[in-house]
Amino acid sequence: MKRALCLLLSLLLLLSLAACSQTQPEETKPETPQAESQTTTEIVSEPEPEPEKPITASDINVQRQDSSKKDSSGQVICEHYYDLVVVKGESEVAAAINAAFQADYEEFLSKNNEVEQYLSEGFQPTPDAPFFFTVEAEVTNTEDNVLSVLYCEKWYMGGTSNISYRGLTFDLESGKPLNMEDAFPLSSTTVLDCVKNTLSYYIYQNNLSLDTSEELLQPESYCIQNRQLVLCFDSYTLGRDGTTIACPITLGGQMKTAAEQRSMLQKNEWIGFWCASEDNGQVSRLVMDMSFETDGSCSVAFGFLETEFDFVGTGTYQLSDDHILTMNLSISDVYEESESYDATYQFEVFSGNDESILIQPTDDNSLYGQRKGSTVLIIPYDTFFS
């Protein structure tokens, strides 16, 4: 009995210990604070576009678009072609310039019906005397970031043949057409005044006209050839055929140093031309005769005719290193011998090849009341009378 009781007590004790072990709370470890997770995003920058390569002469091609007509034997009886200028590359500049060239080509194509009409109306061109409607292109400048092209258009359909010239000029940095006044290192007033003087001289030399209209002194277009401004004209403007006239303005500034200009002035006798606008819309061509000696003396005569001057003057001159020509003169009126006066004239000298331009630098002490920026075009006598 006692043994059974001991076993029962032992069993109860074991059960009690087991129950305690199940109800004792588990020891919990404090949580270690976790650092907030950070997401790092790598920023990948877009690669910068490569700068556009400058357009050079090697990037410019002339592609002849030929649709000449042939007879049954394969001989050409009507020359019909156009020289299309193409700038290579995918740049915006190339695209803009090519669009302008394409527009000029499409203008040529718009006249194709006229060619077909002449050929269908019984006109009989032959291989020995073919008709022609052609446009030839010459790339005349790619320097100083300026692209210039001279076009020569020829037309003959059995009657009178015509030749016309025109130019297209572009800024190679922007692809935009370049105005004549913006292409040269001179003020727009000086450029336009020099153009008038050049054309006035040309008209006088070819037509012996003292006066001309303002309208004739405006070129229809221009190009740059041998770094020089060239004025372009259609047929029947300054003659039956069109023409090109070089104007002594060049790209890039002075072509000669002051020392070279002094030598140039001293070795020639000069005849100069400039224009005076009249109230009636006409432009009178004025003439100046000039000579410069090595001893610093000079002589000047000016009026409307190179054979009959109104005023003559003698004195001294200086040409500074910054190309300013100063003339101190005693001037007499040819027709009023008692009329004389002293005058000081100053000009900025801009020299081209054989010609020079004398530019009025201020409105003070000006020759014949010329305004600032107006010009006198001077040419060696030997050149003028050759």
Residue ranges and their predicted role:
Residues S21-E31, E36, E42-I271, F311, ...:
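Compositionally biased intrinsically disordered regions enriched in Thr/Gly
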Residues S16-A19:
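C-terminal motif of bacterial Sec signal peptides marking the signal peptidase cleavage site
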Residues L150-Y156, D234-Y236, A276-D279, D295-F304, ...:
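Generic short beta-strand segments
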Residues V283-T326:
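N-terminal glycine/threonine-rich, aromatic-flanked beta-hairpin/loop signature
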Residues I324-S386:
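Beta-sheet ligand-binding and adhesion/scaffold domains
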Residues L265-L286, G315-Y317:
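Tryptophan-anchored aromatic micro-motifs
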Residues T134-V139, R166-T169, V287-F292, V312-Q318, ...:
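Hydrophobic/aromatic beta-strand elements that line small-molecule binding cavities or substrate pockets
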Residues K2-S10, L14:
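Sec-dependent signal peptide recognition
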